[in-house]
Amino acid sequence: LASRYGMHSELMGIELLDSPIMSVRTGLFHTSNGIPSHYLRNFYRDAYEIVRLHMPETKMVVFSASGHPAAWKRFMSGSKYKNVCMDIHLYHYRDDMALDITTPRGLSSAIARNRRLIDEAASAGFPAIVGEWSGAAVFTNASITPEGCSAFERVFISSQMASFTKARGWFFQTWKTEKRIAAWDARVALGTLERAMLE
């Protein structure tokens, strides 16, 4: 990709690997399943060198935080690494941190989590890109009407966008879904927002 598109003016950068699952310590003697972090670090350093042969330093080299931005502190901190950015995926529907956003506490906790992860990337020494996010969330209140669900999704989406102010940019998960699924289809999810919110 870098040799083919690296000099194109339209290219902003290249992500080295999308969404690898990194092994992390879960206790004193246990680690989760995934790729050991030292393998990922070596891969990213080697890939950076190869990509930079074909792509100028004005273009970003992006690597995935693998869900753990704080784990990358002091990584690629040498002066030879230029314009390196961390990709953070911010989903709220399926992981251990998923909360019911139909409560004020759940909504504020979800948004605080976004801000915390973006701040962790900055503390690790990297600008962040929200490489994937959606309007999908947990709705545990069975009495919500379809209209109420739409209102919660709109508040959730606009609140998430407001939480991205410290990120270099964001990418909604999907531009278009086959059945126009509101939480996953950018045309539907972002369509009801005022244009000023998208700029």
Task: Please provide the spans of the model-predicted regions.
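Extracellular glycoside hydrolase catalytic/binding regions
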Residues: 3-6, 10-13, 17-161
